[in-house]
Amino acid sequence: MADGGEREELLSPSPVSPAKRQCSWPSPQAHHPRGSPGAAGGGAGGVGSSCLVLGARPHLQPDSLLDCAAKTVAEKWAYERVEERFERIPEPVQRRIVYWSFPRNEREICMYSSFQYRGGPGAGAAGGAAGASPAEEGPQPPPGAAAPAGSAPGGVAAGASPGLGAGAGAAGCGGEGLPFRRGIRLLDSGSVENVLQVGFHLSGTVTELATASEPAVTYKVAISFDRCKITSVTCGCGNKDIFYCAHVVALSLYRIRKPDQVKLRLPISETLFQMNRDQLQKFIQYLITAHHTEVLPTAQKLADEILSSNSEINQVNGAPDPTAGASIDDENCWHLDEEQVKEQVKLFLSQGGYCGSGKQLNSMFAKVREMLRMRDSNGARMLTLITEQFVADPRLTLWRQQGTNMTDKCRQLWDELGALWVCIILNPHCKLEEKSCWLQQLQKWSDLDVCPLEDGNYGHELPNITNALPQSAIHSPDSLSRPRRTVFTRAIEGRELHWQDSHLQRIISSDVYTAPACQRESERLLFNSQGQPLWLEHVPTACARVDALRSHGYPKEALRLTVAIINTLRLQQQRQLEIYKHQKKELLQRGTTTITNLEGWVGHPLDPIDCLFLTLTEACRLNDDGYLEMSDMNESRPPVYQHVPVAAGSPNSSESYLSLALEVALMGLGQQRLMPEGLYAQDKVCRNEEQLLSQLQELQLDDELVQTLQKQCILLLEGGPFSGLGEVIHRESVPMHTFAKYLFSALLPHDPDLSYKLALRAMRLPVLENSASAGDTSHPHHMVSVVPSRYPRWFTLGHLESQQCELASTMLTAAKGDTLRLRTILEAIQKHIHSSSLIFKLAQDAFKIATPTDSSTDSTLLNVALELGLQVMRMTLSTLNWRRREMVRWLVTCATEVGVRALVSILQSWYTLFTPTEATSIVAATAVSHTTILRLSLDYPQREELASCARTLALQCAMKDPQSCALSALTLCEKDHIAFEAAYQIAIDAAAGGMTHSQLFTIARYMELRGYPLRAFKLASLAMSHLNLAYNQDTHPAINDVLWACALSHSLGKNELAALIPLVVKSVHCATVLSDILRRCTVTAPGLAGIPGRRSSGKLMSTDKAPLRQLLDATINAYINTTHSRLTHISPRHYGEFIEFLSKARETFLLPQDGHLQFAQFIDNLKQIYKGKKKLMLLVRERFG
């Protein structure tokens, strides 16, 4: 008996629930049908009597006939039915039924106490085989199928070795923080106490041990159960989660592992029935006294109702008993907190994919699949709750109103939701009324405006441009006229599918089903030439059947149907190949083909290929009977597979499931299929392909798998319209680059010729290659270009091109040192890759591989890198590319590694590769640099050859673009007098044209630096004539050039200065600049820095005489004009600055002999003209009188 605190919790009043069914009893005069009162396990002592303890039997002792019968009854029948069926039930029988009614398998406890249950895809098989869930009342295999082996209840039975239970627990969950693991630790630490089973009710206390921060806490736990399922749980910890807390787990495992230590009583109504009136009165009074503060109001209320003849309580026979199990009409399913499921899903959706909510929702979907495998009715129940929250997501309305698509993460969750509903609708043992109810609900959700569409769009996009073109005849009709297909449409369409077909039943029920010796005409299509059964159905639909079988715990049946589907695909492949051979000549002449598969299998909403692949590989997994081993860090180890022969007696028995898995994956990935419409659909194709390839990479290729791989690759290469690797493909078929990269890497060690042939064939990207003939409508599959944007349908084109580049890079790496293969790969790259950036990446990759730091250079691959670089130069010569300079520098580096002949070649053919600026400033300059000479160890003739080519290039570039190349040409030609003169003349001739003053000044400074001052003066004079410096441009960048030009002319002599000053006066109108020039010219005598041989006069120049007089007058006039200009818009805060300006002007005015008179007259004029500016004029008087 539990202590008083236990009873407080369990006896709190509540309305009658399924766990507390009405228990009736005969009148006092009636005969007691269950034997004498003393026959009950508790004896006449009732509450105070000693409890009956069940002894443990020897571990290997077989169950008695009583136990066998009690097990079956406890699993299948509600206890009320037992009571109705038999007038008298002996007490030992009652005890054994109550005993065996508790769940017997720890796997089920783990499933309801952890998201991260470690049951892998094969767990359904294990669960079904172990009888882990006697979930449904008599679950049957699909019609015609054999029941799963060992379907009798078993699992971890009572009395089993505790070690086995611990193993199951360890194999069941990963991660020390999970409730199941924590429950095991609580159980192992002895924290479970006061365990009492009263009928179908288990109670006990669980103590959380003290920690450094928290004291020990004891929680009261109560569990109700019925027919080997836990139907309700209560724990004092107040757990708010979808699944059971660690305390419920600990108590449940205690009952499973230590049944001999649990005090067992029959339902409390049985004990009460054995008491006489005095005992009952004593029992009630003691109970009220022990809990008077809690139950006294309820007790008085019940007493009043019982004493009232008209009360409702007296209208019903019997009274509720929470320990008597469920009634016949109660639904028999495991306890699932529906409100918590709703709240958790709502919370995860509100987080919008952040905080790991996507992973949590995926875990919930995985839990649904796990329940389906265990044939637990809560799977569909939980999925319904999840779907209701998904449909109520407020973001759906927002996305629809804005006409935007939902996020990829959310879209993937919706896809999984739709796929799960397909599995549920195709449940092979689904009752018709259940299926009808689900279909009604699905139709209701599908009719909602916010229900996401199957293609990932909301239909607000403009009609696809390709729908109006001739080639769109192969597509479905315009999106505006298409039937609306939501994520639930596939599941709703499942209403037409059934399992009653006799051929289908024979396929899934027998491994040895073959064609009969005498076939009727209607049966010939059902078998291939070897007598193997075929299943002729739409492939994704057939695979959905496989998924449904697999998901509902029928792995053998799923395998049989999978083999039949693969035999069908093989036959279709063979027939299409034969048809293609007859049409091959015509198709090759046309250069185009039709698509036989309008609906691709990879990226399909039903994911058919992945379904078949997983079904087959699950049968071949080695580790832990199909369970995915997980570390405590939840990191999965890659699965290990072995060859498992197809079931003995099968026509396919010479093959293994693993080879079939590889074959069907290759078939699906190699299928030629149209690129679907819409960004999400295209992205899904790429994502699913990569997922399937990652699973293929987990297979260790042995001889048998290599043979399968070779055979299928040959079929794909020879294939016609069904193969994406055939000789002719449709221009809008999905490229095979990613798939071919896997095939190339897998085949290379075993069959290099086949691997290269396949990879080279896959390099195609027809949607780009046929664009040149886009205007040609003679072929029905050519697209007319009616929009300026490039290929508007192919949203993932960038990703596809990058995968094409990866394939090419893989081939280049593998072919290192093989000249013939490298040449073939180079030609394929040049023909099929159309992105200059990607070709440049390939060139860089080839260069890195060809020039390793720890070994010698590979010249063949280096030449390939150079060829690719040259192609990039030609492709980007007339287009804008922000990486162009990087590309040019890299090409020169690559050519340098190749050798001097490569440098000479690019110098001589520069006009096809570079702009004049690039050729002179980067290419030629690098080619003749000291670093290059040392790197190549060039001798004198080679250096001269390079220099000659560089000079020729420089002159050609200078002629073509003198503005940008004149200076570079002079630099490159400075060591050759004739070439230098030619470059100089080009610069002079161009000076009168479009060259700017800054360009001319730069060249002039260079000429002075090289010792040609007169030529520098000539260029500076030309530059001065192109300059115009306004009065207020006192910070113009050309001021330094003007000052330098004046200093140059002054250093050359009086005549040069006299020639330049008129140009200065004409071009410069800024007073401060002119005054600065004038001051510099008067400080030193002209000609002091002149050329050798020219004599200087040695006298300072006078400002009153030419040529400085003209400069002086211009400076004074500039000051006067600037003064008036500044006074027009002057503000008081600039008065001080203006006075300083006048002070500088006075210095210039005072240079001539009568300068003071001119300045005084100037000031007087200012006072007269601007007398309104009194404050300013006052400052002028104070400073200048």
UniProtKB/Swiss-Prot annotation:
Gene Ontology MF, one: zinc ion binding
SWIM-type ZnF: 219-256
Region (Disordered): 1-45, 123-153
GO cellular component, one term: Cul2-RING ubiquitin ligase complex
Domain of life: Eukaryota
PROSITE patterns per record: ZF_SWIM
Sequence ranges of Basic and acidic residues compositional bias: 1-10
InterPro entries tied to this protein: Znf_SWIM (IPR007527), ZSWIM4-8_C (IPR048370)
Family annotation (Pfam families): ZSWIM4-8_C (PF21055)
Keywords, comma-separated and alphabetical: Metal-binding, Zinc, Zinc-finger
PANTHER family attached to this UniProt entry: ZINC FINGER SWIM DOMAIN CONTAINING PROTEIN 4, 5, 6, ZINC FINGER SWIM DOMAIN-CONTAINING PROTEIN 5
Name of protein: Zinc finger SWIM domain-containing protein 5
Gene that produces this protein: ZSWIM5
